[in-house]
């Protein structure tokens, strides 16, 4: 019996929150941590799922009976991938799949997309099915949207399947065009620090869907297919509803920030706001950090998806010397990403832990986010 081992990474989003489903720009990078799927083919048309993180009885699914809503809980994500592959015309066969993960669940680092993509690659390989990765990302997104019921965009699956080591990936969510830009913070003595606030988020809850509906209404009123297609910030003034105005302003400015950071990271590219040569890496990370902090304020005040622990973490990190910080993921819980110099790293961690405990909150957990390769076969 052939056993295959497939790994798909989580992701951190350097810039562009809630811009993906608005057809704007996003700038994620893959993490070293992710989900591993150890899989063997079955001849009985069943998918049998086990997870080390959910050590209950195995979840057994008949491929022929899969339909949206037929599987719930964590198993809905891999089941949804099998359903979406078959619905897209790919005759994947049954498999026994053991899942393991070193990603925190509900921390805004796309554990669900990593689960989907590792299983999708395993099912395709065991079934002798070839799917281009760009298309597989869309299939995994369909699984999350239609089978699981989370109205997410394309960023998470694209990051899991298409990222490169030592790069961030600028994705135009309108055209799905990708530009890989160098992102090597360690070479500049900088750490991309993920702060898990220990407040779990769930994107199937109503607030995420409400934000998406508000964006769609704002786009309709502005006469465009999606807010990400608007480049003139003054266009938001045409929106009479102050809530819709704020939502649109966030999408337009965050998409612009994603492009600005991507341009800044390109080798030898001068850019507005910095010296012409800009080989001072500290100067570059101060520039990027400033944009991260601007993005957090936009997510907090205009898009209203932040939460108290994230706001405190961002403020404390910056006060302790971080270049900048922002919440990442869909919001309402999850993590903060901070750019911190190596010499300030221990102090930032210590101050954040002390600040959380003093407020009666669980101590945050930390993860050094190293830009890593996309999903791949391990064995």
Q: Predicted regions span which residues?
A:
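Gly/Ser-rich oxyanion-binding loop with an adjacent helix/lid
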Residues: 1-7, 11-18, 22-25, 63-64, ...
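C-terminal nucleotide
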Residues: 1-11, 15, 36, 40-71, ...
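N-terminal cofactor/phosphate-binding cores enriched in small/glycine residues
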Residues: 18, 30-31
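FabD-like malonyl-/acyl-CoA
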Residues: 47, 113-117, 335-339
């Amino acid at each position: 019996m052939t056993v295959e081992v497939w790994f798909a990474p989580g992701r951190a989003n350097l810039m562009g929150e809630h811009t993906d489903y608005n057809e704007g720009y996003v700038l994620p990078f893959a993490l070293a941590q992710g989900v591993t799927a150890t899989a063997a083919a079955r001849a009985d048309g069943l998918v049998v799922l086990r997870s080390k993180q959910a050590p209950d009885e195995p979840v057994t699914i008949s491929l022929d009976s899969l339909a949206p809503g037929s599987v719930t809980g964590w198993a809905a994500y891999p089941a949804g991938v099998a359903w979406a592959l078959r619905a897209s015309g790919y005759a994947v066969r049954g498999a026994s799949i053991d899942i393991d993960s070193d990603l925190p669940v509900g921390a805004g680092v796309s554990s669900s997309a990593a689960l989907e993509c590792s299983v999708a690659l395993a099912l395709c390989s065991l079934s002798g099915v070839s799917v281009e990765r760009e298309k597989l990302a869309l299939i995994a997104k369909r699984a999350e949207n239609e089978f699981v019921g989370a109205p997410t965009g394309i960023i998470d699956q694209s990051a899991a399947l298409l990222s490169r080591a030592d790069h961030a990936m600028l994705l135009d969510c309108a055209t799905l065009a990708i530009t890989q830009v160098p992102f090597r913070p360690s070479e500049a003595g900088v750490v991309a620090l993920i702060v898990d606030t220990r407040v779990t988020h769930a994107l199937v809850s109503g607030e995420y869907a409400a934000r998406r509906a508000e964006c769609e209404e704002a786009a309709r009123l502005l006469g465009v297919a999606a807010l990400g297609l608007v480049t003139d910030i003054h266009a938001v003034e045409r929106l009479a509803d102050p809530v819709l105005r704020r939502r649109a302003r966030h999408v337009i400015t965050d998409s612009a920030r994603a492009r600005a950071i991507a341009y800044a990271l390109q080798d030898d590219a001068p850019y507005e706001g910095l010296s012409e040569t800009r080989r001072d890496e500290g100067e570059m990370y101060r520039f990027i950090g400033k944009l991260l902090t601007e993005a957090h304020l936009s997510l907090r005040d205009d898009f209203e998806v932040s939460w108290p622990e994230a706001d405190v973490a961002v403020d404390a990190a910056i006060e302790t010397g971080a270049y900048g910080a922002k919440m990442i993921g869909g919001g309402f819980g999850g993590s903060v990403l901070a750019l911190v110099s190596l010499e300030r790293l221990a102090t930032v961690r210590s101050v954040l832990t002390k600040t959380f405990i003093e407020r009666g909150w669980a101590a945050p957990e930390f993860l050094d986010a190293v830009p890593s390769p996309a999903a791949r076969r391990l064995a």
